[in-house]
Amino acid sequence: MSKRPDWIKVKAPNSSEYYNTKDLIKNLKLNTVCEEAACPNIGECWSKKHATVMILGSVCTRACRFCNVKTGRPDLLDPHEPQRLAEAVQKLGLKHVVITSVDRDDLEDGGATHFAECISEIRKSSPNTTIEILTPDFLRKDGAAEIIANAKPDVFNHNVETVPSLYNTIRPGARYYNSLSLLHNIKKLSPEVFTKSGMMVGLGEEISEVVQVMDDLREAKVDFLTIGQYLQPTKNHAEVAKYVTPEEFKYLERVARTKGFLMVSASPLTRSSYHADEDFEKLKENYRHRHCEERRSIDVAIS
């Protein structure tokens, strides 16, 4: 694919806040998906002291064609990671934290218990901080959804990543309907937890396929949808088939809103945790507004 269009380009990070965040993460020996996945928004986010911490090590057991995270034999599980994560949240003064992880197919529960321990430690030291987790699919990990649901994150995010027709080439280790099932099960087990999912475009999908994914996610009771442009991390990854224009993203956002999502974020640089703190506040407000509208409708019907 030709060079990136102007609407994709971002400024190189150079603020003192960016380097302060970088130093803190390094000193606490934490991994971030911002660095590992070569996120284009790292400069903006770290300058605001926002970082998405990646737990369960830095090596993934899968090799998705879109992802820049290292693959191979995973690290040993670090029992002290939840405490270090909680310390970082406290030192950064985060009001909202996003926690993600590599896939850990080697673990009996896929790392679900470790996620729960991280949530618990943050609740102890920063009880007013809201917690969003972005998890792997826990494929063939019985009981993992229950562990996560019982931990009660404020937001549960699991990305379907792409349309089902591209799974064999882009996300070969995953199963589309397993991802939908996980999202549905979390909402069923903990209805009060907001659910969220995201996908990339520009991999060769058809618009009709993207719309079908929207319908599938709403069927799974997903509250929040994110859609962003796929960017090729290295020449060894899947090539960009198309750079979707900002106007096309606006169209996708309009269509998604008609499906009934509480929140939709769709733009070239949208990523799962981009502006997550601000979006969470909007998500809560949209929920309150919809709930009030539903109550009014019920009252009118009764009267």
From Swiss-Prot:
Enzyme's top EC category: transferase
Domain Radical SAM core: 46-262
Gene source species: Rickettsia bellii (strain OSU 85-389)
Cofactor entry: [4Fe-4S] cluster
Binding, [4Fe-4S] cluster 2: C60, C64, C67
Name the record gives this protein: Lipoyl synthase
The family this protein is said to belong to: Belongs to the radical SAM superfamily. Lipoyl synthase family.
Matching Pfam families: LIAS_N, Radical_SAM
Residues reported in the UniProt entry to bind [4Fe-4S] cluster 1: C34, C39, C45, S273
GO cellular component, one term: cytoplasm
Pathway: Protein modification; protein lipoylation via endogenous pathway; protein N(6)-(lipoyl)lysine from octanoyl-[acyl-carrier-protein]: step 2/2
Major place of residence: cytoplasm
Protein's UniProt keywords contain S-adenosyl-L-methionine: yes
InterPro entries: Aldolase_TIM (IPR013785), Elp3/MiaA/NifB-like_rSAM (IPR006638), LIAS_N (IPR031691), Lipoyl_synth (IPR003698), rSAM (IPR007197)
EC code(s) of this entry: 2.8.1.8
PANTHER family linked to this entry: LIPOYL SYNTHASE (PTHR10949), LIPOYL SYNTHASE, MITOCHONDRIAL (PTHR10949:SF0)
Location(s), subcellular: Cytoplasm
Catalytic activity: [[Fe-S] cluster scaffold protein carrying a second [4Fe-4S](2+) cluster] + N(6)-octanoyl-L-lysyl-[protein] + 2 oxidized [2Fe-2S]-[ferredoxin] + 2 S-adenosyl-L-methionine + 4 H(+) = [[Fe-S] cluster scaffold protein] + N(6)-[(R)-dihydrolipoyl]-L-lysyl-[protein] + 4 Fe(3+) + 2 hydrogen sulfide + 2 5'-deoxyadenosine + 2 L-methionine + 2 reduced [2Fe-2S]-[ferredoxin]
Top-level division of the source organism's lineage: Bacteria
Keywords: 4Fe-4S, Cytoplasm, Iron, Iron-sulfur, Metal-binding, S-adenosyl-L-methionine, Transferase
Gene3D superfamilies linked: Aldolase class I
Entry GO MF terms: 4 iron, 4 sulfur cluster binding; lipoate synthase activity; metal ion binding
Record text on cofactor binding: Binds 2 [4Fe-4S] clusters per subunit. One cluster is coordinated with 3 cysteines and an exchangeable S-adenosyl-L-methionine.
